[in-house]
Amino acid sequence: MADPEKLFRVDVVTPNGMIYSHRGSIVDVRAIDGERSIMYNHVPLLTPLVISEVKVKRSREMDSRIDHIAISGGYIEFSNNVATIIADSAERARNIDISRAQAAKERAEKRLKEAREKHDERTLERAEVALRRAMNRISVYNTKGH
């Protein structure tokens, strides 16, 4: 059985409130400078995150449950064995509505095409971000094995 002293709290917070709060042995995130794996007693850290998947391994066992969370960027702060992820939006894989995510992808692709035709750089950038968010949600949903 896992030693509870080697687990730390992982919280994911959005403007809408707490999305996730559990104890974990490892949290994997994608920072702007690459992948990071954080474990118990990691050095204090504050770093920006990109649109990506957060993975939280719930115990130290090899076959431990892994929770998958889609985030739309944000920050991770780790200190005193508490990892806090602050994101504009976040969704656990089990809560993702795949039909809504696919519809968002289609809307973003349509806006992207229109922006390219009109040479509208501002709309193009926003459509690219919307597409990355939708693709991330779909990817996280599929990672869970649905």
Swiss-Prot record:
InterPro entries: ATP_F1_dsu/esu_C_sf (IPR036794), ATP_synth_F1_dsu/esu (IPR001469), ATP_synth_F1_dsu/esu_N (IPR020546), ATP_synth_F1_esu_C (IPR020547), ATPsynth_dsu/esu_N (IPR036771)
Purpose of the protein: Produces ATP from ADP in the presence of a proton gradient across the membrane.
Gene: atpC
Primary residence: membrane
Keyword set includes Ribonucleoprotein: no
Superkingdom per UniProt: Bacteria
Subcellular location: Cell membrane
Record membrane topology: Peripheral membrane protein
UniProt-listed SUPFAM superfamilies: Epsilon subunit of F1F0-ATP synthase C-terminal domain (SSF46604), Epsilon subunit of F1F0-ATP synthase N-terminal domain (SSF51344)
Subunit structure: F-type ATPases have 2 components, CF(1) - the catalytic core - and CF(0) - the membrane proton channel. CF(1) has five subunits: alpha(3), beta(3), gamma(1), delta(1), epsilon(1). CF(0) has three main subunits: a, b and c.
GO cellular component term, pick one: plasma membrane
Family indicated by similarity: Belongs to the ATPase epsilon chain family.
Key words of the record: ATP synthesis, Cell membrane, CF(1), Hydrogen ion transport, Ion transport, Membrane, Transport
Pfam families from the UniProt entry: ATP-synt_DE, ATP-synt_DE_N
The UniProt record lists the keyword Transmembrane helix: no
Gene Ontology MF term list: ATP binding; proton-transporting ATP synthase activity, rotational mechanism
Protein name: ATP synthase epsilon chain
